[in-house]
Amino acid sequence: MAFINSAAEDEVQFEGIKRRLRSSGITKEAVTSLGAGETLEDEFDIASTSDLASGGPVSIRSHGFVPIVVDGKITGYIPYKSNDLTVNVDGGKAAKVTKALSQLTRRTEVTDCKGDAESSLTTALSNAAKLANQAAEAAESGDESKFEEYFKTTDQQTRTTVAERLRAVAKEAGSTSGGSTTYHCSDPYGYCEPNVLAYTLPSKNEIANCDIYYSELPPLAQKCHAQDQATTTLHEFTHAPGVYQPGTEDLGYGYDAATQLSAQDALNNADSYALYANAIELKC
């Protein structure tokens, strides 16, 4: 995950999408093999996902976890942390860069939920509300050691913040006629690449499910730390700042990576909330 700060040390808003990936059944196009000593280079234009029109110096850094995939399943994670890179941005040129999500402003119609997808999402929203409320209660006054397992502290302020965010998720999931987000049963913008379960556009407070959300996930997991429709929906709601500010990031996917985070990062990690809600539900 990359973070950009202005000269005033304010974090520049990310205007791209945040995807949740499945943890098993991962197809080959999503995996890169590196031999000993090999490196991989990639390029991305930060002006396409952040408003840098004001120009001037900005600092860029990245940290998180790289998943290790064996036979299509995530089996572990390697942590990474970059150095801080300071660059001077030409605001005029940055303003002319085509935005990655510019087509969103031209949207005129979104297909409504229908049939099996509508039924599945309705159930997922109900389950997400239930799980979020249970987890909120546990965060506020439940087992300290269980909370610390996922959020790396028993500090009361952190417990209160986690509980407040989860209650906000429960409220949003429980409202299908109002609320702060738009939830799409399908992919209106074309960002459901292979292995993507769902995604959120935080700058628009929009969430969309992908086909494998319905075909690969059960409504509720019967196994600790497994993915399901309810916790995927919960995960996505935490990304949306319209539900609770600030929206969460994707700093560690899955139990192994999420439980290696610092307390500060765990508080801002979407999967930490999904995993904790699953653990409370199944008494993990």
Swiss-Prot record:
Cystine pairings recorded for this chain: C113-C185, C192-C210
Catalytic reactions on record: Preferential cleavage of bonds with hydrophobic residues in P1'. Also 3-Asn-|-Gln-4 and 8-Gly-|-Ser-9 bonds in insulin B chain
Annotated GO MF terms: metal ion binding; metalloendopeptidase activity
Active site: E236
PROSITE patterns, per the entry: ZINC_PROTEASE
Cofactor note: Binds 1 zinc ion per subunit.
Enzyme Commission (EC) number: 3.4.24.39
Record keywords: Cleavage on pair of basic residues, Disulfide bond, Hydrolase, Metal-binding, Metalloprotease, Protease, Secreted, Signal, Zinc, Zymogen
Required co-factors: Zn(2+)
Record SUPFAM superfamilies: Metalloproteases ('zincins'), catalytic domain
Protein's UniProt keywords contain Protease: yes
GO biological process, one term: proteolysis
Binding residues annotated for Zn(2+), in chain numbering: H235, H239, D250
Enzyme class: hydrolase
CC terms in the record's Gene Ontology section: extracellular region
UniProt xrefs under InterPro entries: Fungal_M35_metalloproteases, MetalloPept_cat_dom_sf, Peptidase_M35
Subcellular location: Secreted
Family: Belongs to the peptidase M35 family.
Function, in words: Secreted metalloproteinase that allows assimilation of proteinaceous substrates. Shows high activities on basic nuclear substrates such as histone and protamine.
PANTHER family to which the protein is assigned, alphabetical: NEUTRAL PROTEASE 2-RELATED (PTHR37016:SF3), PTHR37016
Name of the featured protein: Neutral protease 2 homolog AFLA_119780
Origin species: Aspergillus flavus (strain ATCC 200026 / FGSC A1120 / IAM 13836 / NRRL 3357 / JCM 12722 / SRRC 167)
Classification lineage: Eukaryota, Fungi, Dikarya, Ascomycota, Pezizomycotina
